[in-house]
Amino acid sequence: MGRDQRAVAGPALRRWLLLGTVTVGFLAQSVLAGVKKFDVPCGGRDCSGGCQCYPEKGGRGQPGPVGPQGYNGPPGLQGFPGLQGRKGDKGERGAPGVTGPKGDVGARGVSGFPGADGIPGHPGQGGPRGRPGYDGCNGTQGDSGPQGPPGSEGFTGPPGPQGPKGQKGEPYALPKEERDRYRGEPGEPGLVGFQGPPGRPGHVGQMGPVGAPGRPGPPGPPGPKGQQGNRGLGFYGVKGEKGDVGQPGPNGIPSDTLHPIIAPTGVTFHPDQYKGEKGSEGEPGIRGISLKGEEGIMGFPGLRGYPGLSGEKGSPGQKGSRGLDGYQGPDGPRGPKGEAGDPGPPGLPAYSPHPSLAKGARGDPGFPGAQGEPGSQGEPGDPGLPGPPGLSIGDGDQRRGLPGEMGPKGFIGDPGIPALYGGPPGPDGKRGPPGPPGLPGPPGPDGFLFGLKGAKGRAGFPGLPGSPGARGPKGWKGDAGECRCTEGDEAIKGLPGLPGPKGFAGINGEPGRKGDRGDPGQHGLPGFPGLKGVPGNIGAPGPKGAKGDSRTITTKGERGQPGVPGVPGMKGDDGSPGRDGLDGFPGLPGPPGDGIKGPPGDPGYPGIPGTKGTPGEMGPPGLGLPGLKGQRGFPGDAGLPGPPGFLGPPGPAGTPGQIDCDTDVKRAVGGDRQEAIQPGCIGGPKGLPGLPGPPGPTGAKGLRGIPGFAGADGGPGPRGLPGDAGREGFPGPPGFIGPRGSKGAVGLPGPDGSPGPIGLPGPDGPPGERGLPGEVLGAQPGPRGDAGVPGQPGLKGLPGDRGPPGFRGSQGMPGMPGLKGQPGLPGPSGQPGLYGPPGLHGFPGAPGQEGPLGLPGIPGREGLPGDRGDPGDTGAPGPVGMKGLSGDRGDAGFTGEQGHPGSPGFKGIDGMPGTPGLKGDRGSPGMDGFQGMPGLKGRPGFPGSKGEAGFFGIPGLKGLAGEPGFKGSRGDPGPPGPPPVILPGMKDIKGEKGDEGPMGLKGYLGAKGIQGMPGIPGLSGIPGLPGRPGHIKGVKGDIGVPGIPGLPGFPGVAGPPGITGFPGFIGSRGDKGAPGRAGLYGEIGATGDFGDIGDTINLPGRPGLKGERGTTGIPGLKGFFGEKGTEGDIGFPGITGVTGVQGPPGLKGQTGFPGLTGPPGSQGELGRIGLPGGKGDDGWPGAPGLPGFPGLRGIRGLHGLPGTKGFPGSPGSDIHGDPGFPGPPGERGDPGEANTLPGPVGVPGQKGDQGAPGERGPPGSPGLQGFPGITPPSNISGAPGDKGAPGIFGLKGYRGPPGPPGSAALPGSKGDTGNPGAPGTPGTKGWAGDSGPQGRPGVFGLPGEKGPRGEQGFMGNTGPTGAVGDRGPKGPKGDPGFPGAPGTVGAPGIAGIPQKIAVQPGTVGPQGRRGPPGAPGEMGPQGPPGEPGFRGAPGKAGPQGRGGVSAVPGFRGDEGPIGHQGPIGQEGAPGRPGSPGLPGMPGRSVSIGYLLVKHSQTDQEPMCPVGMNKLWSGYSLLYFEGQEKAHNQDLGLAGSCLARFSTMPFLYCNPGDVCYYASRNDKSYWLSTTAPLPMMPVAEDEIKPYISRCSVCEAPAIAIAVHSQDVSIPHCPAGWRSLWIGYSFLMHTAAGDEGGGQSLVSPGSCLEDFRATPFIECNGGRGTCHYYANKYSFWLTTIPEQSFQGSPSADTLKAGLIRTHISRCQVCMKNL
């Protein structure tokens, strides 16, 4: 019992003992009461009172009360010892003992753990604003954020394209009484009519019009010498602009001495004492030869760069409030044409006011009708042709009759041919009525004249009421008024107050709630017709109506009014390409380009004399005196044609005109006297002209023409004597337009002009300065504006930066076949062709002579199994095997015999835990826990109550400039402005040159222009049709592109074995292991058939180590040429081209830039044998040549049997293949025959020789904006740019054709390393296969080739040592490497317009002959990693690999049966050397190899920087702790990357040759990942996500870390490139205040990611890892530039501010 139980049981026991004692006493007493006593007198009877009788004893009475407690009895005798009881329960804890004496002083204990962090202090005041930091480097690309919420409804898009024409509707009959009420819509323009029949001969025409002015007469003879003229008056003009550079003068006479120049005034000038004016800019000199200068010092940081590209997509913001409803969206893309719908309900009754004019829509032209029956008698015909003149009876003088009457006005004649020369300007017309007010022009420049201040004007009339202002802000809520109650029923009404000041206009209020419906109002006045409404939404289709009554219409209704605009149709399919459009109007001047000024161009050649200009504007009156009367001029040219002839007979009836034309439309005349097009009736297109009628009789002679233009000037006459000064002459003729003079002085203001017509909108003004951000109050973006008129060609832009390569243009349609050209000149011999396929077997030749000893043969195929050999000798003992894996659990053993008694056992384990104790005292506060995960997003709270009005805040700082708003819609025209004030004198001031006038009419064909500048590159033309075969060899071509690499050579002599490589990686569990050791050699087996093509697998192999170069093989003899191959299959038929009509020769076009390189043309037929060409230039070094053919021809072989038909190959992948290697250049075809029609745009030709410099053409139009240039790598980080506008997503272009090879560039410096790629997803581990059934022992197999590496097998028995084999022969030379990377990128072409044009492949050309092998080419630079190749055929099993490193135990497989032990096989032949790996980075020398360690701080293996080989990967070890001492690892050295992980990777040994593993509290520390912090220590597989991975890379140079001690990224030294950026990690401590640190020059001191706890502690004894509270990391901090001023101030940083105080670093490697 417990202590408490015994305390309770004591009093109860005593009560039971007392009760028992009383009971025993009463029992004894009652027993004695029934006993008769005979030893007393009278035998117990009382005889004293006479005889008494005693009745029987009564029943037992009730128990009496409890008696008093009896005394304790004496102790009883000692009983026998009882049986030993069971062990009692553990007793209660005893009372605390007496405090013992004070003990001795104990030994000094170890240092305690650091205490918990103190309570954070209050945040200090914010420091002053720091200096702007350096621009940070680009961060690593973040993971894509979650998908954001759907955006608000977009703005209305532009209207969609017009839908397709609908199907013809069902006819509907109208009753006769309703036909007049409806009219049909105006029909669309009719189709082009068929050509009409020839008209009847016309009547005699009227007198023709005045003839055109005659051509200018020939130059007159030189005039006689004039008289001496008067001296003219002149003003000293303003200095003109500098004239053009004149043509070179004749060479002067060389002079040895300087002759003084004697001026007319007698003053002598010495040329050597005076400096002439600055000459014109000289021509460029010849190209100089410069030596490479020394490397300059590092420049200052550049200016702030332009805004960068758009940043990465940010994290999604919170869901915004619902936006305003957008405008109606654009029509969707055109859908497919729907099926015919159900017949609609009957339409409304038609209405036609005139039944006779009722006309329906114009139908389609019908088919020709059948031959009709003969018609009825027709009406009288038109008058016949005039008869011949009648005979005359009178005299000859009287034969001519009187003139007839004037005929009626003739029809309008056809437009005449353009006049060769313009007529003289007509007289000034009458002044037109004032035009409407023009649109407000752009603000003019500030004036220069300042007038005197005028007198104060009178008070003006009241102005027009202004437009209502913007609504003002809402006022503050007023205080509550006091309520004053009055005694009476009504309050006394006060007097009206004074009017208050005018309030500001309020802002637009929030829309009020919908009011109650008002009472109906009175009928209002009829309103004006409303504007055309917006088309409503398409309603839901109504129910199908009942079929209407059928009615018949006999007359065709009139064309009705235009119907309501229909619902926009769905977007139609892409139409066929239209014809070329007409030339567009010249656009407005474009904005000036922003290129930098280019270098001066070469001087142009002298231009040809220009044509005579048109007369200039009327100049101001001259100041000369009137001249003398001139002499009579020469006779003028022929006059204009005479008056119109007589009226002819009426022509045939015209086509009926359109009805409902608006006859009130007037045609306004524009500024250049051109007719402006106004909306009127749209007629059909003009029909084809009829056949010409017979000529009419000759008209009367025309009137005398106006005098012709003056002839060309005659030669100059001899110079006359100077005349006297003349009087003021009449105004001279207008002069030619002179060059534009410099800006004159500001004149006086001119008089008031009459209001001009509405001007065109002015050009865009210069961009204004950035305005303040406007307040947007409920504004919405306007609709998209109309497209502007195309601008006029701008000035030639400066050369832009080099753009990126353009998109690949679409493949064009085949061109029309050209005509056969004349035979060309013979060309040079062609380049060697590609190797053709092997020829067919030839006829057996005569046996040749015995040849020399051939090369070593290729290893033969596997032979048949040989006979079993004799058992070999027992070999020497083999090497000690590796530690085997744990064996499988054995079967249960037999029951053992009874053992002897064991020795006493050890102390037992502790018992089970006791019951929970009482609640302990409150402990000391714990440390801050780790930061919790962010909670889920809470629900929105209830709206709070309205707060009281706050105080006015202080004005805020000036806000940042807002992003540019969307372009607003065009505003309404403003109210007319006040008339201008015209001061006297203004009329005499000529204004500045006005804006460009409206576009003139299209001019006639001008004279041939001078040669212009090269045009912008044309788009890629469509390929032409295949050309006709040429017969003449082409001219010598350019140097060809390097040939494709040759076929693999024959194996060379085997090289010596390479050095032992590093251990390979631990692969995942492989398939079933390769066969056992090789058997005996078998005989050579028969040749097997080719196997099927294996599957494709996209796993690239790891590059092997580069083997040593093999010895050069013996060159083989030259082989024979193969015979011609079999004819190929017939290709697909090409598209038949349309034969073009021969057109007139086109004008000579301007020279364009070289076009993009088109696709190669089809191969022409063989040309005729040409003359021997000249020797070509040395070609590029070709790829490595083919190896020579084998030795002399052997004995002829028999013809083989035809092979069986192969199975169809697996379908190819559905992706575009890589572009093939360039084919050989085709031979040049014959010149084509002349063609007069301009052909389609041809494929750009090959690059021609450099032409002579052209003359300077007019400025070109501004080029399209180029793509952003490729940003060169830079060590200097730019400042962050402003946020750019988001770009639109472009369509994916087709792959462009390969550009021409660029010119050889100077060797560039090595670029920076790119950002690390995203880690790949780890592959899934395959399942272990089941063990197969036990097989019988097989025959001795042939030696297999090397197979894939199997997983580690169970440890076998130690075999006998085999005999040492002979050294194998030197391996053959390895295969050639992969093709090198493409050459430098050429100049970028224009971005092509991606189009999807379906093309058909052309016909396949005949196969070329096999060319000789080219010379070996230079080794190209290392290409980028290629796409994963297709899976090769399964390889043969290779020899057994070396023993691998002890691997982690794999999954336990199923237990297989025990196989028979096989015999020991002989040693297999050495395998062939493997294929060479990809070329590595160039090393500095063979003896130098640097190692670079990269830690990912994630659970993914990091990638080595580009060009570096990965040697191994593993886990990031920071340091060990053993015997309470730390051993640190440098994270920049390879020792910090252990290939395998264990919580206890080491053991310790004592001097007694005894080692212990995981037997004490030793620890290992590893770099950790970003996995969430665990609450408890993790063990086993849970550890892996917390351990950082690492890779050891082979670097060509040493890598160092540089630290900025600032928040900015430091720069690498000059000549070094960046590998990664990070944070400066200094040192670390953990348990027992032990730890270590990093060398600040080591890359290990620059971790890419910052964590307050970057490493995790693993306990070796327990096998667990955890983040304990005593781990500290130490980092370099940011230090201000004033290093020695003031002491550091203590500070505590929370999680969000830590990175602002951590120094940044960068790991750099020297460029080689």
UniProtKB/Swiss-Prot annotation:
Where do Low complexity bias regions lie?
A: 68-84, 140-153, 628-640, 698-710, 721-730, 769-778, 813-823, 831-844, 1302-1328, 1400-1421
Repeat among keywords: yes
Disulfide-linked positions: 1504-1593, 1537-1590, 1549-1555, 1612-1708, 1646-1705, 1658-1665
GO CC terms in record: collagen type IV trimer; collagen-containing extracellular matrix; endoplasmic reticulum lumen; extracellular exosome; extracellular region; extracellular space
The ranges of region (Triple-helical region) come to 184-1484
Question: Compositionally biased, Pro residues: which spans?
Answer: 215-224, 433-445, 752-766
- Molecular function per GO: extracellular matrix structural constituent; extracellular matrix structural constituent conferring tensile strength; molecular adaptor activity
3'-bromotyrosine modified-residue sites = 1490
- Check the record and name the Gene3D superfamilies matching this protein: Collagen IV, non-collagenous
**Keyword terms of this UniProt record:** Angiogenesis, Basement membrane, Bromination, Collagen, Disease variant, Disulfide bond, Extracellular matrix, Glycoprotein, Hydroxylation, Repeat, Secreted, Signal
Biological process (GO), any one: collagen-activated tyrosine kinase receptor signaling pathway
- Residue ranges, annotated region (Disordered): 60-237, 302-448, 507-640, 690-906, 1157-1480
The entry's localization annotation reads: Secreted, Extracellular space, Extracellular matrix, Basement membrane
Q: Which residues are glycosylated?
A: 138
Give me the stretches of Gly residues compositional bias: 121-130, 711-720
May I ask which residue range the UniProt record assigns to the signal sequence? 1-25
Entry text on domains: Alpha chains of type IV collagen have a non-collagenous domain (NC1) at their C-terminus, frequent interruptions of the G-X-Y repeats in the long central triple-helical domain (which may cause flexibility in the triple helix), and a short N-terminal triple-helical 7S domain.
**Oligomer status and interactors:** There are six type IV collagen isoforms, alpha 1(IV)-alpha 6(IV), each of which can form a triple helix structure with 2 other chains to generate type IV collagen network. Interacts with EFEMP2.
Protein name (Swiss-Prot/TrEMBL):
Collagen alpha-2(IV) chain
Origin species: Homo sapiens (Human)
Q: Please name the taxonomic classification of the source.
A: Eukaryota, Metazoa, Chordata, Craniata, Vertebrata
What gene is this protein translated from?
A: COL4A2
